[in-house]
Amino acid sequence: MAETPADHDHFAPLRGAEFLVLTTYRRTGEAVPTTLWFAEDGGVLYLTTAAQAGKVKRLRATPAVQVAPSDRVGNLQGHSLPAQARVLEPHEFALAIAALQQKYGEQFTTLTTQMDAARPAGSRIYVVVTP
């Protein structure tokens, strides 16, 4: 399907937000919100998390998600937007890393270095969220 200008505007309500709430769904349909850093690039969002995080299992089972701008502790700062999420393949990680590094700079480097030191190699994954 061809991209339209509306696709690039889908996530406009998130612009300027430092955090978002990603809502994934259990197989029962129960919503599970999680606050995360994110970066937008080319009309898509990039996120990072631990490979073993519950949200990864949930989005693999049910790729339909909701995203909403939030503060650091998950208080919503706007309306939720429907979206689709998928775990990126390792060869796609560079796009996500570059977008997150561009947005968060040294904070991103410091945080991921500290978190990765406490986990085995390959335990960090990246997720792309599309309209």
Stretch-by-stretch model annotation:
Residues M1-L20, N75:
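Extreme N-terminal tail/first-helix region
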Residues A6-D9, V32-T34, Q52-G54, T113-Q114:
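A generic local structural motif
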Residues H8, L14-R15, L45, P82-R86:
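Residues at structural and domain junctions
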Residues V128-T130:
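Short, well-ordered beta-strand micro-motif
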Residues D9, T24-T28, L111-A117:
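Short helix-to-loop capping/linker segments positioned immediately adjacent to catalytic or ligand/cofactor-binding
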Residues Q52-Y126:
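Short, structured beta-strand-loop surface elements
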Residues H10-F11, L45-T49, A53-R58:
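Covalent nucleotidyltransferase core used to form phosphodiester bonds in nucleic acids
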Residues A17-A51, V65-P69, G78-L81:
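Short beta-strand segments
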